[in-house]
Amino acid sequence: QEITSIESYKLKPNSMQVKFITNLRKIVESGEQRALLISATGTGKTFASAFAMRELGYKRVLFLVHRGQLARHTKKSYEKVFGKSVSMGLVGAGYHEYDADYIFATVQTLNRNEHLFQYEKDAFDCIILDEAHHVPANTYQKVMKHFTPKLWLGMTATPDKRDDNMEGRN
């Protein structure tokens, strides 16, 4: 008897993810350039973002995470949604896959000029900020000032959590 890998099944968004995609589409169509997905840990925010990028047709995406292991894990999740339909690459930790359609990197890596300046300001249609409650930190601010994507998408389970590097900002 032949065993079929679960990976071969076409992934479909769950009800929370479908609602998120619908709401994000409305936000984008209204002309907004920033959106925030707030959902508890383990509810599928990463997959929700991948399904949204696919459904909304974003061609060039930068996904920023807080730790290198998350960059690799997130890339694998996106590969499950997209298959081979877009190229995906890592930047940082010895990886220099700058030309991929979808880039996964830590904010600390992109904060360094040798990586940041590989990209024009409008290089990405969407930039996704995982753990968006860290956005007030200087490392995020430098990256955010460099880019002008059509959409900034923040994701967090804890929107009220404060970053240690906030320097008194609210």
Labelled PLM ranges:
Residues 34, 59-60, 85-87, 125-126, ...:
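Residues that mark the start of a beta-strand
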Residues 58-61, 68-94:
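Conserved helix-turn-beta segment of the N-terminal RecA-like "Helicase ATP-binding" lobe
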Residues 42, 66, 157:
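Conserved H-loop
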Residues 125, 133-170:
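Post-DEXD/H (motif II) to motif III coupling segment of the RecA-like Helicase ATP-binding lobe
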Residues 71, 110-113, 129-136, 161-162:
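Catalytic P-loop NTPase motifs of RecA-like helicase/translocase cores
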Residues 93-126, 137-142:
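Conserved helix/coil segment N-terminal to the catalytic DExD/H
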Residues 63-64, 154:
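Structural beta-sheet core signal
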